[in-house]
Amino acid sequence: FALAPRGAPHPATNFPAAIVAIGGHPRAPYASLMREDLIQRYDMAVPRYTSYPTAPHFSPAVNGETYARWLAALDPAAPLSLYLHIAYCAEMCWFCGCHTKATRKYAPVADYLDALLEEARLVARALPARMRIGHIHFGGGSPTLLTPGDFGRTLAHLREHYNVTLDAEIAVELDPRTADEAYVAAMARAGVTRASIGVQDFDARVQKAINRIQPHDVTARVIGWLRAHGVSAINMDLCYGLPYQTVASLLGTVDKAAALAPSRIALFGYAHV
């Protein structure tokens, strides 16, 4: 569970990546969005910003009292963002460096969620006011491993302890392999406004090599369900540097992704950890 001032870099989305807005002909927008000066400026190996302080800087000096003091010092009038990390998956994708664990049982997920909701309550109590929340992001792991009931209960809990605005963006990282239409409908009813879909690559050989078998029609079907239930803001994650990829095969994946007309495509470079 993480909290950030609204407008600050979001811990779940501020990895080094190219964010591409999609519209028009599948490849036509790309060249006009590329700037050589930005490519040169950001073409470097840097740590992933996922939290503050970053992991190497944690020490006994940063304890619960320190955290509570920081929370109490926030501007009561400032809008905030919340990030909830669901640290479990049905199985591991071999390219992934995220903090997660595979489980075939729901009991560990349920226990983890209870602890997460208690932390959300304690953080709310430490804030100087019942502060406005303009953005909620569920990341992981696989947030859609939660049952529809637990997902709805989580959002209800946040609304109870925080002032979640009526126009708040509620975003979820969604695994198309495990979410059926009933689940998508339940998310929409709970207030989800944006879905981020992990694809990485549409090539079957690449998918097998990274242990993420996800045919194109599975992704397309979930996107159709999302739009049918009113979730029109859709992100797609692609990754370059994976086994068996070529420039030609990656361009084929980009074309297929663009044809599905997502709001954004995030293109990540594979990072071996």
Regions found by a protein language model. Give the residues of each.
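Extreme N-terminal basic, low-complexity initiation segments
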Residues: 1-13
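Divalent metal-dependent hydrolysis catalytic cores, especially in the metallo-beta-lactamase
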Residues: 81, 94, 170
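Flexible, acidic/Gly-rich N-terminal and inter-domain linker regions that tether
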Residues: 15, 22-81, 129
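Conserved non-cysteine loop/helix-boundary elements of the Radical SAM core domain that shape
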Residues: 100-273
